[in-house]
Structure formats: C-alpha cells, structure tokens
Amino acid sequence: MLRLESLIVTVWGPATLLARKAPLGQIWMAATLHAKINRKKLDKLDIIQICEEILNPSVPMALRLSGILMGGVVIVYERKVKLLFDDVNRFLVEINGAWRTKSVPDPTLLPKGKTHARKEAVTLPENEEADFGDFEQTRNVPKFGNYMDFQQTFISMRLDESHVNNNPEPEDLGQQFHQADAENITLFEYHGSFQTNNETYDRFERFDIEGDDETQMNSNPREGAEIPTTLIPSPPRHHDIPEGVNPTSPQRQEQQENRRDGFAEQMEEQNIPDKEEHDRPQPAKKRARKTATSAMDYEQTIIAGHVYQSWLQDTSDILCRGEKRKVRGTIRPDMESFKRANMPPTQLFEKDSSYPPQLYQLWSKNTQVLQTSSSESRHPDLRAEQSPGFVQERMHNHHQTDHHERSDTSSQNLDSPAEILRTVRTGKGASVESMMAGSRASPETINRQAADINVTPFYSGDDVRSMPSTPSARGAASINNIEISSKSRMPNRKRPNSSPRRGLEPVAEERPWEHREYEFEFSMLPEKRFTADKEILFETASTQTQKPVCNQSDEMITDSIKSHLKTHFETPGAPQVESLNKLAVGMDRNAAAKLFFQSCVLATRGVIKVNQAEPYGDILIARGPNM
C-alpha cells in the first residue's frame, strides 16, 4: 500500500492528493479495497466538492485514476443514501409510536424476570363503611325503569333484628372483626309499608308497569299457590316509631288495620282487570321458525335382530310419503295426446315438424274403420268357431284339400285377397272353399287396388296392411311376420280406440283362431288345447325391393389421408409402394397408433393394399382397387 502510494505520488503529484485521510484517498480506498467507512467519516465527505476536484484536478491525472475515483464516489454516495434512508424510517417509527396509546399493564401479572410481587399489588384494601342513605325510599320512586316484581313470587321477610350491631362500641373492634354489619347482610324491603311515605301511588307502582298483562297470562296460576298473595308488612324500625307511642297501643293497631284494608281494596281493583284480560282469548303468537339442527346420539343402543328386520321390511312410511308427493310440471292434455297418437307413425318421432292437414285427411280416410250396425251377429260365429267340433271339421277339410292346388291358387294373384275378404264378409255363413274360389279377381279390381297401394309409403292396400313375407321350407310362415288390419279381422265389431291410459289393441298372436278367413296347418294336436304355430299366410302385396345399404360416410381425417395418398400415387414418377414406418417418422406413440388405425380402415374399404412380409416388420402400402 505504501509502495503504491509512493509510486502514485512520484508520478502524478504531491503526497497530499491520495493520502489515507484525504477525501480522494478515502474514495480511492472505497473503490479499490472496498474499505468500510463509518458514519463520522461519511458525514465529513462532501460529494459535490470531490466531484469538482475530479473534474478539475489541481495536478494532471491519468484516465484510469479518474475512472477509479468516479466509481468510488458512486459507492460512497450509495452508502450515504442508505444511512439516510435508515434514519428516516427509524424516525417515522418513533413518531408513530409516540402517538400510539399504550395499554396499561395488568397489575395482577408479574413483570418479566420477577418471581415475587409487591405487597400492595396482592393486598386488597380494607372495607370502608359507606353511607347508603335512605336507600329504601329511593327504591320506591317510579323513576327506576327496570324495577319489576311479581305478585305471586314476592315474600317479605327480615333476616336480622333491628337492634343487632347497630351501635358497635369502639373498644370491641377486635372482637367484631369477623362480624358483618347489618346493612351489608340485610335485604331491603321493596313495599315500604312501614316507611313515612305511605302514598298508594308509590307503594303500588309495580302493579301498573308495562308488560304486566303478558306476565300474568304466561304464568301458571297453580305455581306458587302456597305463597300468600297479600303483602305482609314487616315490623317497623325503632327510629320510625314516634316517641311516646307504644308499638302495642290500640291506636297503633288501628293504623295498621286501616293500612291493610286499603291495601286489600287496592289489590282487588288491580286484580279485576287482570282477570278480565286473562279470560279474553288471546291471538296465538307466531314463533320464528328455527332451522333444523342435527343431533347426534352418542349413547349405545342395542336393538334386537328381529325388530331391526321388521323395521327394514316395513314399507308403510315409504308409501305414505309417496302419496304426499305432487307431480311437478305441466301435464299434457289427454286430447292432445290422443290426437298425436292418431297421427302417422313417422310423426311420432318428430316433435317440431308439422303434418299437412290435407295429407292427414287422406291418411285418416284410408285408415278409417268401417262401422257396422250389426255388432252382435259376430259372436255366435265366434263361439261356433271356437268349439272343438268346428276345429276338428276345419282340420279334416284341410287334410282332404290338395296342398298343390291351394298353393297354385294363391300364387296366381297376390293382390286379390283384399277384395276377397271384402266380398266374403258380406255373408255370414261363407265357407273356406268360397273364400278360396273368390281369390281370383278381375283386372279392374287389381288395378284399383294397385292404385290404393301408392297412397302412402307406409300403407299398402286399402283394407289389409301387411309387410312382405316369404314362406318357409315347409310352406308355412310364422304369424309374427304379418299384420292384419281390424277391418278384415273384425268387420262387425267396433274397433277399440287406443289411448295413452289404456292398453294396446290385442294383436293376432293372442287370438289366432278368430281369423276365419285363413286355414291353419297343425303339425300335431296337443291333448288340452291347440296352437297356431304353423299357419299358411297369403301375401297381400307384392314383395318390396330391399334398399341397398348406404355406404358409411368417411371421416374427415380418413378422407384427408385418402386424398393425399391418391395424389401421391397419381403423381408421375412417384413410387407405387410406400412404407408405413417412414410415414410415421417424427410422430409420437399416440399419433402413430392413429395412423395405423386409419390405414386399417382404408385397407378394409379397399382403398389401399397392405403387405407385411414378417411379423413386427415394415408395413408396405400400395394403391387399392377402390381408390
């Protein structure tokens, strides 16, 4: 350090320029050695003067030395600003603390570091005799708003005699140290019947207080029945009796009796309106509804097993609660539901669409049930048909009929049975042979029925609605493959209307023996009852051509991959075989799996051809026939 200073002095100037105690010397030491400078030295340093000396030095300075001194000035200035900031904050805290009120320490708490308290801190002051004055008279003054007594719960009594410890002698203070004064242990008498102020207004003020009616109404008259309702005055004090008057004199007794009579009369006057108000029916007060709070029973309760099972199996509580529930929401009118049920089947699944009234009239006209006047003529035939003899006769005639001839007749014309059924129903006793003979219809009938088929796409034929059916290998079809309208099944019976509240109309599977227009073929006859599993059914309309299955619409990603592959394979000079592993380069596991899935979809649809020579090997894709 000394060697460096001597070198600087010899080169740039006198020894006083960068001396240790000089301002520039301290700046240079703070910049190079980061020396600590205390508050005193920092206060003595004048930053303005040092900056002027660096800018206009008395001796020439090198640029390096001036730069070092400038850095030292910045360091010293930062330290001075930090000290100033700390002083200002401390001063602000002290000012705030001076205006803040300090809490008084608790005298019962010991200060920190002390284990013994002072005698004055733990010693209570001696009791001083206080002169309460005539406190009993002030209690009767009506200015006390909170003063309130009850008639049935008031008892007047004296605990001590009036002459006990009234005038304690000064020489007996040591003996009377543990004896309480009479004023401290004597209850004050509220009625004040023996005081000088004997006015009835002050004495009976407690009977006229507000809210006394409600108190009398809420209290039970049986409670406190043994307590006397009249106030018994206590004997007066000795200083209240005038001198020269004997307490037991007749004059004194007359005064007491007069007071009692006046008190009884006042009590009767006060009780009469109370009884009248008590007899009046009071309106029931509404109580505030309390919120339901959950209560936890922590006691251990043992319930027998059969009792617990009976609780679980008892559903009376559930049924009672279910009856009280009300259906919320708007109920749809029955008329609207009935009209909607009569709409075509296609409109039952479409809520917002409207059906044209002209088309609805045409549809209802074609599906209208023919009403007949003779509804009872159908029942004897049904009973006759359901008899065992009729069934056996039908079966016997069926076996005698040539099966080839019957099938040939039914195959000549498929559209004629609708007209056959309409003509056969006009006669009651029509036989099966006449039905089969009438199956040959005229060309005009066939053309008119063909025109009726094209009314609606969901309705084929005028009288018989059916679905196309194909006979089985045995020449008989199941009864579930055909639906026969009620016009051909029950011409003389009224068609039951289906409503939302009633069940559906019975179908042909429930009563197959009611269809008298068809013959039955039984493979075997059961012992108790017959079944109509095998029945020859006639097609009432031509077999409809089945629509081809619509091709599934490709997804957007699949279409995009398909278009890219098609563009690639159609590009001249492009390779016709691509590797799936090369296409999946740079993809993560999820994206590669999706690419493999899309490739499988395209291969399934014939867009591309997929080839894999070895398991877990490279997958090659090429152009497919459907691209």
Swiss-Prot record:
Residue ranges under compositional bias (Polar residues)?
A: 467-487
Q: Which Gene3D superfamilies match?
A: Structural maintenance of chromosome 1. Chain E
State the compartments where it is located. Nucleus
Write out the tissue specificity statement of the associated record.
Answer: Isoform 2 is expressed at low levels in buds, leaves and roots, whereas expression of isoform 1 is confined to buds.
> Which InterPro entries does the entry link to?
Rad21/Rec8-like (IPR039781), Rad21/Rec8_C_eu (IPR006909), Rad21_Rec8_N (IPR006910), ScpA-like_C (IPR023093), WH_DNA-bd_sf (IPR036390)
Q: What is one GO cellular-component annotation here? A: chromosome
Query: According to the lineage, what is the superkingdom?
Result: Eukaryota
The record's annotation in Pfam families points to:
Rad21_Rec8 (PF04824), Rad21_Rec8_N (PF04825)
Q: Which family does it belong to?
A: Belongs to the rad21 family.
Q: Identify this protein by name.
A: Sister chromatid cohesion 1 protein 1
Q: Which organism is it from?
A: Arabidopsis thaliana
Taxonomic lineage of this organism? Eukaryota, Viridiplantae, Streptophyta, Embryophyta, Tracheophyta
Whichever gene encodes this chain, its name is SYN1
